[in-house]
């Protein structure tokens, strides 16, 4: 298998990422742009602790309504950045969601330098509970909450979906707390109705399933877990969204490029097959020229597929509740 060693890049990334926006290592990112919104809030603390890594930006669609369905979109950074919400695919994924009528929440989360796994999923679940707890203030319609993410953000979105409703799990010999105790809305649910996985590493036990760039002696997942796969495989299973797939998972749509050399496309393909086998509603697109982010991934066709999938799930969910 062809591999390129980038240990120097990893070292530099690890040093600067805690205070820097997501850059190349998190995939292709479009610089911060001005979105068309009716209202927005920046640097809202969702945990009540005054930490920058526990803040989020909230955007409401240009068309004003009493309330909006919600999409939480998480940036990619190989878990190295704790402050990249301002570059969370604003000109592509977030823009499309806003135009489709979704309130969009872009959160920061703790990096692998701030805390080890499962702190990151604790943060994302805190965001979901915050959305429910502060629904009246921000005009959120909590009957539908989707979670989306790119790269490591796709991993967190996928894991939030496949662990839906699971607060603790026994993975081999490891008992993992998936819920956490972050924020002021601990009585709220952290469940989601749908998820979008853009190029996410979802099986951290099999990152060598295809050609990809390696990051020297310590991969991003090694740093996140402070371990090695051959020493503590159960830790890597506990980090893998694929480990938790079952028939109770919400609908999940996957986008993964065939030419992705950061997170190989076989990750998305394995996820897709596992979801189908479990009977989960799922769709997947594997662009032939798609890399890790970039124009071949964020085409109008793919963005429309994402929106159509979420709308179909949302409408079907609404109709089902009406019939009850």
Model-derived regions: residue spans:
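Bacterial Sec-dependent N-terminal signal peptides
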Residues: 1-24, 324
């Amino acid at each position: 298998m062809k591999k390129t060693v980038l240990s120097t890049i990893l070292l530099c990334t690890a040093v600067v990422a805690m205070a820097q926006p997501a850059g190349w290592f998190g995939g292709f990112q479009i610089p911060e742009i001005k979105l068309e919104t009716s209202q927005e809030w920046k640097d809202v603390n969702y945990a009540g602790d005054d930490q920058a890594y526990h803040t989020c930006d909230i955007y409401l669609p240009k068309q004003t309504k009493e309330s909006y369905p919600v999409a939480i979109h998480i940036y990619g950074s190989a878990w190295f950045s704790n402050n990249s919400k301002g570059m969370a695919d604003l000109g592509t994924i977030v823009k499309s969601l806003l135009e489709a009528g979704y309130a969009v929440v872009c959160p920061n989360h703790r990096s692998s330098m701030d805390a080890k796994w499962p702190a990151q999923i604790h943060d994302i679940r805190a965001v979901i509970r915050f959305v429910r707890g502060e629904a009246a203030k921000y005009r959120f319609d909590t009957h539908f909450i989707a979670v989306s993410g790119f790269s490591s953000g796709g991993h967190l979105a996928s894991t939030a979906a496949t662990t839906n409703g699971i607060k603790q799990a026994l993975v081999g010999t490891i008992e993992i707390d998936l819920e956490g105790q972050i924020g002021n809305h601990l009585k709220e649910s952290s469940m989601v109705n749908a998820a979008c996985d853009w190029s996410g590493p979802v099986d951290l036990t099999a990152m060598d399933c295809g050609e990809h760039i390696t990051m020297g002696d310590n991969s991003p997942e090694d740093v996140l877990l402070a371990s090695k796969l051959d020493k503590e495989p159960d830790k890597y299973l506990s980090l893998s969204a694929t480990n938790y797939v079952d028939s109770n998972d919400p609908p999940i749509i996957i986008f993964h490029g065939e030419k992705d050399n950061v997170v190989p496309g076989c990750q998305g393909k394995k996820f897709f097959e596992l979801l189908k086998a479990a009977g989960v509603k799922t769709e997947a697109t594997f662009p032939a020229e798609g890399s890790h982010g970039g124009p071949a991934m964020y085409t109008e066709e793919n963005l429309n597929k994402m929106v159509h999938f979420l709308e179909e799930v949302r409408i079907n969910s609404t109709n089902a509740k009406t019939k009850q």
